[in-house]
Amino acid sequence: MKINNLPEVFTAALPVLKEINEAGYEAYFVGGSVRDLLLNRHIHDVDIATSAYPMEIKQIFKKTIDTGIKHGTVTVLYEGESYEITTFRTESGYQDFRRPDHVTFVQNLSEDLKRRDFTINALAMDVDGNIIDHFDGLGDLEKHLIRAVGKAENRFHEDALRMMRAVRFMSQLQFTLEPETEQAISDNHELLSKISVERIRDEFVKMGIAPGSQKAFQIFLDTGLSEEVPGFRGKKENLALYPQLNFSPTTEANLWALMIILLKLPNDKIPHFMRMWKNSNAMERQVADIVAFFDLISSHAPNNYDLYKAGLETIVSTIDLAHILGQPVNGSALVDSYEALPIKNNRDLVIDGHFLLKNGIPAGPRVGLLLEEIKKAVLEGVISNNEAAITEFISLNH
């Protein structure tokens, strides 16, 4: 198979391949970029594999960075772009089920492609656009299959994160998991506990917000992977609702909010759950706000102060979450009500703490409490947002 019209991300890198070829070495585009080219998906960057050793690449190109030279990777800076170029290699000994203990450089592309995770990622393309396919990756692309290269169990023992990558690719590409590969995940799911939470989280989020997440999540549950991640052990019955949803979350915050709701976590358990997954403080706050506002609109209509405290981003996220869960909510009415608020943040209020101090309010906690009272009064339409009305409100109430 030959590709004649390459997108710019490839044509810009062709001179790099040509220079390596002209120096007497083989060089190919490899991996996800070739897969995405064949699927007409957006390509972020390209990876290059070569028979040249790292020191030979450094002799060919003037500007290089030793990004992973021990494992055969050199970054080449060329025409304002950076390209990761990795020597053909084989790997052996995976005591931590993630990184190889030994890397051996080889001169054969086929040997290099053997170590890759799935057949659709074991494709290569030469400088003329010819596709090299030693493991029927093209056939699996046509069949929409995620299949491990060679024996699936071996691939997962080499890198247990590949089991999460399998369900992630299922979700992103809306492919099916090949039965033997699925069985190997079921047989080896315990190995996932050897992998850092951060890496598992990244794959889980990519799976959860992609268009095929319902089917992928079902496999995530059926194979036992869900038993090896923070907070999910023994919760299969709760999580089984996810594959039945009509829509997938499209943001990371809504994915976590959805998990919290399905798991029926009380509000005081949310911080611990989010930290178990090594989420940032900012993500933790964002998710807690969405869950709190979802609980609020599920019980009663929000007033102006509720909308003010939530903010537009949380309101929109919560509307999306309600749609995912099939809960009736008048989203446009909520947004319209928010847009009609007399103030939307602290800066919109014509006075601040300094104004209160100047008007005889003693410094201390009372200043903050009074500011909140004033905001509520403005939001509820009791007073106008001007200094005269606020001054009168203070004199009458304090």
UniProtKB/Swiss-Prot annotation:
SUPFAM superfamilies: Nucleotidyltransferase, Poly A polymerase C-terminal region-like. Mg(2+) binds at residues 45, 47. GO terms for biological process: RNA repair; tRNA 3'-terminal CCA addition. Pfam families: PolyA_pol, PolyA_pol_RNAbd, tRNA_NucTran2_2. CTP binds at residues 32, 35, 116, 159, 162, 165, 168. Its cofactor is Mg(2+). ATP binds at residues 32, 35, 116, 159, 162, 165, 168. Keywords: ATP-binding, Magnesium, Metal-binding, Nucleotide-binding, Nucleotidyltransferase, RNA repair, RNA-binding, Transferase, tRNA processing. It catalyses: a tRNA precursor + 2 CTP + ATP = a tRNA with a 3' CCA end + 3 diphosphate; a tRNA with a 3' CCA end + 2 CTP + ATP = a tRNA with a 3' CCACCA end + 3 diphosphate. CDD domains: NT_ClassII-CCAase. The keyword Kinase does not apply. Its EC number is 2.7.7.72. GO terms for molecular function: ATP binding; CCA tRNA nucleotidyltransferase activity; magnesium ion binding; tRNA binding. Homodimer. Belongs to the tRNA nucleotidyltransferase/poly(A) polymerase family. Bacterial CCA-adding enzyme type 3 subfamily. A single active site specifically recognizes both ATP and CTP and is responsible for their addition. Catalyzes the addition and repair of the essential 3'-terminal CCA sequence in tRNAs without using a nucleic acid template. Adds these three nucleotides in the order of C, C, and A to the tRNA nucleotide-73, using CTP and ATP as substrates and producing inorganic pyrophosphate. tRNA 3'-terminal CCA addition is required both for tRNA processing and repair. Also involved in tRNA surveillance by mediating tandem CCA addition to generate a CCACCA at the 3' terminus of unstable tRNAs. While stable tRNAs receive only 3'-terminal CCA, unstable tRNAs are marked with CCACCA and rapidly degraded. This is CCA-adding enzyme. It comes from Lactobacillus johnsonii (strain CNCM I-12250 / La1 / NCC 533).
